[in-house]
């Protein structure tokens, strides 16, 4: 592991300003004058020692090793095919050869949004619309980068890049306030912290998703006014209403189920995942094994999380991990579960502290990382070495340090200054950028 390459120090200079006779204004405090200096928007490129970031209308790559620019990956003013004025965000295909360019983003709820997406080929500089049928939600790459699935109007669609971006409609029963395919309903998004319920299997031959039937959930209405952001001119004279399904305590939730679609035969099957009648399915995830996807289930009390390994072709589910905690399974624990190779990284506070438990794909515990302190972030797992990189509060509640836990059980602290350390690792785990601050 190469040592720390770039070290950013964030110090607030209030004392210096005042001792120099400077006048402290409200604008100084609320503006950027005393903001910490850091590199923002770093997006590590998988398997490399480079990262990408947005700079105006461009996406530019930089070297972790030198900090110097490597190249321009995307320039909105220099594309072939479709032309766009700008963009809001982007994501790489798993093979790094293409990008999804996100434009015209419209927020829906706290985590959900719809946008107009474009497929960009980095080598040819060609930009093509993902779909001409209207804005899309949660576009999801297949692992080979040759397919993209997305949701529109509560239905799932599939785009095949090798077939001139041919578009197939996978589901047809989606309907607002009745059935949702591939997206969580409002209460699952809000309370369980996710906005995507759709994944390919590892070889891209199957598409799997969660389906929410909210037809029996009672409706709640909100008044809408012109003054909302963005402004609604249609409500200038009279307020309107937005009605959606909102299950209050003691009332029916959506009925959730899991499904798979064979991309070659177009056959759709329901996956046989056991679940309590009033329980939840808070995640669906891909693994590196084409015969396995992982589906989470949770009881209504939310103190029991089950991980099922499901074969998307046979539809058979097998319980591999049953996680029980004294109070409730934390949202950040669910979000930080990783499936890499034959390993499952599971954060849990079952001991009273948030530690990291490493299982194999059969649910057998291999090792425990942590101690009498909380692991506060999981940065990644190097499949080549078995090293796990994480942030922890091992020195105290107001301190964060970066660590690596080796496969042999040895743990090494990678940061040497007490305070608050936050890391961004390169895709090959050879470098990381550390952002540091303290209260002085």
Descriptions of predicted regions:
Residues 21-37, 263-272:
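A short helix->beta-strand "capping" segment at the edge of beta-propeller domains
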Residues 42-49, 90-98, 138-147, 151, ...:
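Blade-terminus and WD-like Trp-Asp/Gly-His loop motifs, strongest in beta-propeller folds
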Residues 68-106, 127-137, 324-327:
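Blade-loop segments of beta-propeller domains
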Residues 64-67, 121-125, 161-164, 262-266, ...:
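Short loop/turn segments that connect beta-strands within beta-propeller blades
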Residues 57-62, 109-116, 153-159, 216-222, ...:
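Structural motif
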Residues 32, 104-109, 113-116, 166-198, ...:
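Predominantly five- to eight-bladed beta-propeller fold
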Residues 39-43, 50-61, 71-73, 88, ...:
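Non-catalytic accessory segments flanking enzyme active sites
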Residues 33-38, 79-86, 177-193, 276-281, ...:
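Short glycine-/Asp-/Thr-/Trp-enriched loop segments that recur within the blades
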